[in-house]
Amino acid sequence: MNPYILTPDLNGEGLHIGIVRARFNEEIGQAELDACLQKLGELGVDERDIMVVTVPGALELGVALSHMAETFEFDALIALGAVIRGETYHFEVVSNEMARAISRISLETGIPVANGVLTVDTDEQAQARAAGKGGDCALVAVEMANLVAALEPEEDDEDEDEEDEDFDDEETDRR
């Protein structure tokens, strides 16, 4: 058996990437962003093809990601930030709702969203993971953008025109 295997494509040339970073826990989010931008550059993404916006906190990431997905032609999106556990249930609410929003946006739009929002117990844990997570998100965004593009059916203008004509004829016959 010889299955067709799509191998990971980490060539970022020509890709358009949108990044949303939460400003809450500023130092951690900025460390993630710096590492992410560096890795995107290493992967060949032109800095002119990257848009970065910031939002107040993790719960606002979803709104910005949703508008970016609907308004611009991004190949992938990246969410960055940190939610650090406190003494109340708020951590669970923010973490769960933020993750749910990110997944929903990706599934509903078909645009990959790399979730780089750290959910940790302490500032030290967040600081230790920030740069690595930012770079990982760049890799995920480029790989998934290329995978989605590879899985898209190729458009054949002549076949589309014929299909449109056939569909129009069927519609006419039904009336």
Curated annotation (Swiss-Prot):
GO process terms (BP): riboflavin biosynthetic process
What intrachain disulfides are recorded? Answer: none
Top-rank taxon:
Bacteria
Q: What is its EC number?
A: 2.5.1.78
Q: Which SUPFAM superfamilies match?
A: Lumazine synthase
Where composition is biased (Acidic residues), the residues are 152-175
Which residues are catalytic?
90 (proton donor)
| Pfam families reported for this sequence | DMRL_synthase (PF00885)
Q: Which UniProt keywords apply?
A: Riboflavin biosynthesis, Transferase
Give the reaction(s) catalysed: (2S)-2-hydroxy-3-oxobutyl phosphate + 5-amino-6-(D-ribitylamino)uracil = 6,7-dimethyl-8-(1-D-ribityl)lumazine + phosphate + 2 H2O + H(+)
CDD domains linked: Lumazine_synthase-I
List, alphabetically, the InterPro entries matched: LS, LS/RS, LS/RS_sf
Question: What is its EC class?
Answer: transferase
Residues that coordinate or bind (2S)-2-hydroxy-3-oxobutyl phosphate: 87-88, 129
The UniProt entry's GO CC annotations, sorted and at most eight, read:
cytosol; riboflavin synthase complex
- Region Disordered: list its residue ranges: 151-175
Q: Which residues are 5-amino-6-(D-ribitylamino)uracil-binding? A: 24, 58-60, 82-84, 115
The entry lists its GO molecular-function terms as: 6,7-dimethyl-8-ribityllumazine synthase activity
Its UniProt pathway annotation is: Cofactor biosynthesis; riboflavin biosynthesis; riboflavin from 2-hydroxy-3-oxobutyl phosphate and 5-amino-6-(D-ribitylamino)uracil: step 1/2
* UniProt similarity note: Belongs to the DMRL synthase family.
Alphabetical list of NCBIfam families matching this protein:
lumazine-synth
Q: Its function? A: Catalyzes the formation of 6,7-dimethyl-8-ribityllumazine by condensation of 5-amino-6-(D-ribitylamino)uracil with 3,4-dihydroxy-2-butanone 4-phosphate. This is the penultimate step in the biosynthesis of riboflavin.
- This protein is called 6,7-dimethyl-8-ribityllumazine synthase
